[in-house]
Each structure stands twice: as structure tokens, then as C-alpha cells.
Amino acid sequence: MPSLSAADHSVSPPKIHIPRDYNAAYDLIERNLSAGRASKVAFLEDRGRYTFGELAERVNRFGSGLQAMGLAMEHRVLLALTDTIDFPTAFLGAIKAGIIPVAVNTLLTSRDYEYMLFDSRARALIVSEQLLAQFAPLLPNHPFLKHVIVSSGGASGHKAFRDVLAKGLPEFSPAPTTCDDPCF
């Protein structure tokens, strides 16, 4: 297991220690669970509230689900997600799996997204259903893209976000990342 970061607040500015074996998603989630916050609200959206315990399970399921789809350490996934629980789930799940999330603004053009897909060499696109039309013309000829995962659905024959969660594991060990590995 990776170690957690530490901060010495007795000095100004605080001295931060990030250990060699480090995974940012593991640090964020485990720090809150260890502090007894599993039942505390971590994320609030129109559809409901999610506790740190619920977020931890979603992160585990999504990270392991991405690995089950063949995504591996240092592969990239492009995230074009609106402000729902699926964003922190995908972002942190990818990081915990050692996969690099490339989060993009949801107000861009298809041309902008085309550049980002090619430049990042994303192997998967994780997209909110209402943004899928912006990506539709880009998908057939993309040389690196292997998977399209749609939040709030599974439109047009693409994989549904909820299915990746359902097939993932509730317990999932973090990838053996280090403090100087690419993270996002």
C-alpha cells in the first residue's frame, strides 16, 4: 500500500512530505476514512448526497472496472463530465488505478475535443450523455480510442458508466504509483 502524505503545520509555510510510494486518490480517500468520516458527506449534487464511504466504493469499482476493460497504468482517459458524482468517481478511480485522467472543459467545441483526444492519445472517453453529440463525429476514426463510457446512459451502443461501476470490485488496491508518476 502507498503511504499517506503528511504536513507539518508548526512551520510557515507548512512543510509537506509526500512519500516515494504515493497514490493521490488513495491518499484523499484513505485520509478521510481513517479520520472517521466514512458517513460524512463528501459530494452533494441535485440527485443526492454521497458520503466518503460511498465515494470510496465508487472509486474502487470504477478504477477496477477500467482495469477490467484493459486499461493499464499510464494509459489516458479523457473526462468530459458535468458536475455529478460521476466526475470524482471517474477522476479518482482512474488515478487509483494508475490511469491518467485528462479532465476537459465541458463548454468546448468538437474541434477542441478532437485536438485533445489526439494529443492525449486517450484510450477511453468518459462523457456525460448531454455532451456525447459533440464527440460523435470524432469517434469513428480515432486511432487510439478503444472505449466510450457514457454517464447517465449508454446511448448509441456505448458502454454505460453504471455498468462499469456494477462490474467493478468494491475493494481495490491502488496501483503501485510513485510521487513522481504522471497523475493528471
Model-derived features: positions:
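AMP-dependent adenylate-forming
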Residues: 27-54, 69, 153-156, 182
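Adenylate-forming
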Residues: 29-32, 55, 59, 66, ...
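Conserved ATP-dependent adenylate/AMP-binding module captured primarily in the ANL superfamily
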Residues: 106-138
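ANL superfamily adenylate-forming
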Residues: 130-183
